[in-house]
From Swiss-Prot:
It is found in: Cytoplasm. The gene is tyrS. This is Tyrosine--tRNA ligase. Keywords: Aminoacyl-tRNA synthetase, ATP-binding, Cytoplasm, Ligase, Nucleotide-binding, Protein biosynthesis, RNA-binding. Belongs to the class-I aminoacyl-tRNA synthetase family. TyrS type 1 subfamily.
């Protein structure tokens, strides 16, 4: 199966230029292709995964991937299908983000061997280009009429009170020139990107043809949508980042575990490197079993292993199991740090707090009366163990102090997992 056929079978091609010619070229020879990543934050998020993984798929098929980090274009920001003008970031901020993203892209690709990946930065050519050269050598090849007719531009112009600045309007010229420059430097003949990049990609194809008289191609990947219509890649806490310091491996694992049945088999095709035959077999087995599908667990394991590695996957599984177990002794200090980052609602507490106060403080009970009821019915656990009276000498006027949280409840001298019922947790972080 060719790489194009594999992408098609996974539903990963939204648009492409001359797919027959592209498929024939890929079968005849090994090519160089690229995808650009503008630094809009200090980390990539799961919305970047499809193009990143597509580069990897092409490399596995023997082609040379080029990961282009937009050190120059990131200073402007892509206006494509954005409702309003982007805020401009300082050169120092963008430079820091460029380095972070370069480091994140590196593990996905192999930089050794005959088709070693290439890391590029468009600041290398735009940084030395002056305004006159840009307007004379690049600008003359772009029709303003054609640029105004691009859907992404028309939407901004037609939106009341929006409009578009010349800075953002000129963005497609910069991205278009990236293709021409990478064609000249590295022989790149294919640009891939998200479906919102079609206009920018075709601009680059046209410019490369005009400047170098070369036939080049473009391919876009689909916009990832969920069956319920909500945006993919967002949680109540915001974006799901690929940086473990921004989204913990545990939370990342949980994100994939919670994928809806209606989406999970599509996402296995989109995001994993399991074969179509393996995915079809998983789906058939799930449907035949009549019980809880295995697909979400497989998806969560594949993605966490791919992004964070085996150790992080083991930690995510250990945390997931321990939260509902009586014995939580297997949790490491690093596991608790993940929970404190984003795994559980975390609350700072001080010595002297009793379990009733802790339940109310964390929102696991709405009042002291309700909290006492939970404690009396044995529905409250501290680190997996039932909360029990441990302070027989408490003051008569403070009956709730019968169960004080103290040193025996502190894991690593800092953490306590408070649980009410089967699925309601909070993390107490001791000052």
């Amino acid at each position: 199966m060719s790489v194009i056929q594999d992408l098609q079978s996974r539903g990963l091609i939204a648009q492409t230029t001359d797919i027959e010619a592209l498929d024939a070229l890929l079968n005849e020879q090994k090519i160089a292709l690229y995808c650009g990543f503008d630094p809009t934050a200090d980390s990539l998020h799961i919305g970047h995964l499809l193009p990143v993984l597509a580069l990897r798929r092409f490399q596995q098929a023997g082609h040379t991937p080029i990961a282009l980090v937009g050190g120059a274009t990131g200073m402007i920001g892509d206006p494509s299908f954005k409702a309003a003008e982007r805020s401009l970031n300082s050169a120092e901020t963008v430079a820091g983000w460029v380095e972070s993203i370069r480091n994140q892209l590196t593990p996905f690709l192999s930089f050794e061997g005959g088709n070693a990946a290439i890391m590029a930065n468009n600041a290398d050519w735009f940084g030395s280009m002056n305004c006159l050269d840009f307007l004379r050598d690049i600008g003359k090849h772009f029709s303003v009429n054609a640029m105004l007719n691009k859907e992404s531009v028309k939407q901004r112009i037609d939106r009341d009170g929006a409009g578009i600045s010349f800075t953002e309007f000129a963005y497609s010229l910069l991205q278009g020139y990236d293709f021409a420059e990478l064609n000249k430097r590295h022989g790149a003949v294919l640009e891939i990107g998200g479906s919102d990049q079609w206009g920018n990609i075709t601009a680059g194809i046209d410019l490369t043809r005009r400047l170098h008289q070369k036939q080049v191609f473009g391919l876009t990947l689909p916009l990832v949508t969920k069956s319920d219509g909500t945006k993919f890649g967002k949680t109540e806490g915001g974006a799901v980042w690929l940086n473990a310091k921004k989204t913990s491996p545990y939370q990342f694992y949980q994100f994939w575990l919670k994928v809806a049945d209606a989406d999970v088999y599509k996402f296995l095709k989109y995001f994993t490197f399991l074969s179509i035959e393996e995915i079809d077999a998983i789906e058939a087995k799930d449907k035949a079993s009549g019980s809880k599908p295995e697909a979400q667990r497989i998806l969560a394991e594949e993605m966490t292993r791919l992004i964070h590695g085996e150790e992080a996957l083991a930690a995510a599984q250990r945390i997931s199991e321990s939260l509902f177990a009586e014995d939580q002794s297997s949790l490491t200090e690093s596991d608790f740090e993940q929970l404190a980052l984003d795994g559980l609602p975390a609350f700072e507490v001080s010595d002297g707090i009793n379990v009733v106060e802790a339940l109310v403080k964390t929102g696991l009970a709405s009042s002291n009366k309700e909290a006492r009821g939970f404690v009396n019915s044995k529905a409250v656990l501290l680190n997996g163990k039932p909360a029990e009276a441990n302070n027989p000498n408490h003051a008569a006027e403070r009956p709730d102090d019968a169960c004080l949280l103290n040193g025996e409840h502190k894991r690593f001298g800092k953490y306590t997992i408070l649980r009410r019922g089967k699925r309601n947790h909070a993390l107490l972080v001791w000052k």
